[in-house]
Regions:
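N-proximal low-complexity "stem/linker" segments adjacent to membrane-targeting elements
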Residues: 1-25
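A conserved acidic beta->alpha catalytic loop
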Residues: 25, 40-49, 88
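Short, acidic, metal-binding catalytic loop of nucleotide-sugar glycosyltransferases
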Residues: 25-33
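Short beta-strand/loop segment that forms part of the nucleotide-sugar
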Residues: 34-42, 61-62, 89
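Glycine-rich, basic loop-to-helix element that forms the pyrophosphate-binding segment
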Residues: 63-79
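Short aromatic/hydrophobic "clamp" motif used to bind/position activated sugar donors
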Residues: 84
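Conserved donor NDP-sugar-binding/catalytic core segment of glycosyltransferases
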Residues: 98-127
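Single conserved hydrophobic/aromatic residue that forms the stacking wall/gate
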Residues: 128-137
Length: 137
């Protein structure tokens, strides 16, 4: 998996209750090197302060509130990785998400512009999973 550098762009607005877990799930990835970019749409809570306090390596960018698409595009422009991934600030990844995607792209020598993984949804119980999903943490 040589030559893969992934920048993860996390757009956010007023997500202090979720964003730390989202970034923790990125930081815990088995695949490295990573660049984590938080693009804050001018939150009115202390989202950016909490991220800066708990995750010193996260690059924090602030822009006036323009919506999630503008935040993603801003993050892409500021990214240094040769691959870009997105995670919404109220979501989390399995610890091997990027590893499995990079393996698949490398193994099949893909020049993919898009890679998608199955989702697992929880709310007091398991609502959906794929047979291929590894649910161990």
């Amino acid at each position: 998996m040589e030559g893969f550098n992934v920048s993860v762009v996390v757009p956010t607005f007023n997500r202090v209750d979720f964003v730390l877990e989202a970034i923790k799930s990125i930081s815990s990835q088995t695949f490295q090197p990573l660049e984590i970019i938080l693009v804050d749409n001018n939150s009115e809570d202390n989202t950016t302060e909490m991220v800066a306090k708990h995750f010193k390596s996260v690059k924090i960018l602030i822009q006036k509130k323009q919506g999630v698409s503008a935040a993603r595009n801003f993050g892409i422009r500021e990214a240094s990785g040769n691959w870009i991934a997105f995670l919404d600030s109220d979501d989390q990844w399995h610890k091997r998400k990027l590893e499995e995607q990079v393996k698949s792209i490398s193994r099949d020598k893909l020049s993919a512009d898009l890679s998608h993984t199955d989702e697992i949804w929880y709310r007091n119980c398991l609502l959906y999973t794929s047979d291929a999903a590894d649910e161990t943490t």
